[in-house]
Amino acid sequence: LLLMAKLESILDNDFYKFTMQYAVIKLFPRAKAKYQFINRGKHQYPDGFGEKLKEAIQELGKLKLSREEKNFFAETCPYIDPTYFDFLQGYRYDPDEVTVTQEGPELTVKIEGYWYRTILWEVPIMSLICQLYYETTGVQRVSDEEVAAIVEGKMQKYDKLDITIADFGTRRRHSYTVHDLVIKTLKNHNSKTFIGTSNVYLAMKYQTKPIGTHAHEWFMFHAAKFGYKMANLLGLENWADVYRGDLGIALSDTYTTEAFFKQFDKKLTKLFDGMRHDSGDAIEFAQKTINHYISKGIDPNSKTIIFSDGLDYNKVERIVNFCKGKIGISFGIGTDFTNDVRLERMNIVLKMTETLPEDGEWTPVIKLSDEAMKHTGD
């Protein structure tokens, strides 16, 4: 049995990993980080799974940025210095940063190294774990035609809602093949609804826009370095110092939305284009966000909320019905596009657990999102 779980390209990763990597190189080049795999769904991994994963991770070490990829990336992101793309051209995954062990059905994956390097591992390793799981357990997905038909059917419903949608499904996709097919179908569907994907390689392949800004780990690091009280404020200030108003969607739930709004002052509220909702009740969040903008004298319709918390059609419809005409909205849809193949979906994460700011000591990081289920750390 030939196992196919591999990455197509060094850009087969989520856009925000690269945008964060650039910011880390600029601001925190000596910081270190540790990450750990968390098996939320209590999936049982078959014998030999860990070994296969190790092999797949070794293979990642061979990937490098091609000239075509470099040109595409640089043209797409004029706000990133050319030196970054030169750096990326020389970047290679170092499998020594990753430790994989398996005891019975339990899988352990740990990553450790300089943050600016280890930041790229999370998404590829998660997608490899998903794909390998389906391959090694031998379960059959639906046919390619059906995968495309499922996506097409969803898009016809989404079109009627008159909204924009991006694919955010790299990390927990069924496989690269399915992901590729999904983006191809979304692109060929040819309506105004589909606006891009978080996957940089597939954005290049299908001439669409790579989408994303930053993730929880950006704020988790700031909390470890500067204390929780200041994490959101300094995280956003630093982001704005690097990107000067570009990539202006702020992630708001790393330490609960309430704490976020307290620090989201008038300068930041004006500067950022909007925010991303990733946990907790979406409607409640939308109302709080609208209230926040109004309290700062800003028209909520000039701002956007990107919803990305485990969405499907019913959730999206509910959000649209509430937000229409009150505030700008867009949606990032993950597994519901890239892993709707009539099999059990993987519920796994790979999260930063500790960080070593250059002048400190190893500090555990935590995330207190708006849902207890999504908390990590102690």
Where on the chain are the PLM-derived regions?
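Glycine-rich phosphate/ribose-binding loops and adjacent secondary-structure elements
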Residues: 2-6, 211-378
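Ordered alpha/beta subdomains of enzyme catalytic regions
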Residues: 1-231, 240-241, 351-378
